[in-house]
């Protein structure tokens, strides 16, 4: 009788331990009150939120029609929201541009909507063909901003944009009047010749082509 009781007790403890481990995997980290309030203000209808930290940011993973993650700093400032959307939810100009591109026959793997502080919304279509994977970045009006080979390193694949210094913004406004900033990135590969440079992707009207085109402006410590 005692043996049976002990056996049941051990089985119960083992089951409880596994259940506790599962709960730990799903638990959200604690976040500062200003951060919680900032999230609730931006997404008032979202109830179930899981918080984690990535690359120095607090990241809220949630569902609001689609799976999404919102990136904040400790003080509650919003910097980016990445939303996993279906292809059908893309703006029509983006779908038209993709379907007229050289990648139209490639398999669509994933589609992301990137909303970031200080710059325009960007849509990323991930495509693959045999052993090749490419990320295509489009503006909402269907301009292809850039195409990047996917290295399968999905850790911090999309990050909040780097804050553009005022001197660079002034230069762009002066040389490319009416330009729309869609991407800001500081090159961080020490093996590249442009290490430490700031790369700014803009969309600017080309009068010769009579259409909007994507241009890359490269700065070295405030100079183009």
Language-model segments: which ranges?
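Bacterial Sec-dependent N-terminal signal peptides
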Residues: 2-5, 11-43
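N-terminal hydrophobic alpha-helix used for membrane targeting or insertion
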Residues: 8-9, 129
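First exposed extracellular module after export/assembly in secreted or surface-exposed proteins
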Residues: 28-224
């Amino acid at each position: 009788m005692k043996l049976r009781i002990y056996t049941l007790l051990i089985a119960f403890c083992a089951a409880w331990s596994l259940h506790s481990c599962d709960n730990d995997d799903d638990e959200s980290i604690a976040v500062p009150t200003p951060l919680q309030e900032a999230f609730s203000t931006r997404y008032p209808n979202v109830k179930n939120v899981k918080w984690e930290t990535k690359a120095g940011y607090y990241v809220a993973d949630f569902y609001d029609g689609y799976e999404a993650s919102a990136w904040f700093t400790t003080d509650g400032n919003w910097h980016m929201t990445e939303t996993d959307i279906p292809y059908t939810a893309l703006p029509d100009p983006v779908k038209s541009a993709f379907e007229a591109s050289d990648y139209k026959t490639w398999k669509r793997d994933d589609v992301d909507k990137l909303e970031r502080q200080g710059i325009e919304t960007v849509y990323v279509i991930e495509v693959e063909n045999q052993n090749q994977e490419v990320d295509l970045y489009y503006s909402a009006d269907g301009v292809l901003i850039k195409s990047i080979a996917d290295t399968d390193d999905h850790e911090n694949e999309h990050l909040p944009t780097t804050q553009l210094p005022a001197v660079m913004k002034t230069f762009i406004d002066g040389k490319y009047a009416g330009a729309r900033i869609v991407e800001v990135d500081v090159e961080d590969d020490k093996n590249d010749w442009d290490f430490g440079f700031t790369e700014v992707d803009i969309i600017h009207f080309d009068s010769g082509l009579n259409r909007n085109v994507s241009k890359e402006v490269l700065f070295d410590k405030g100079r183009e």
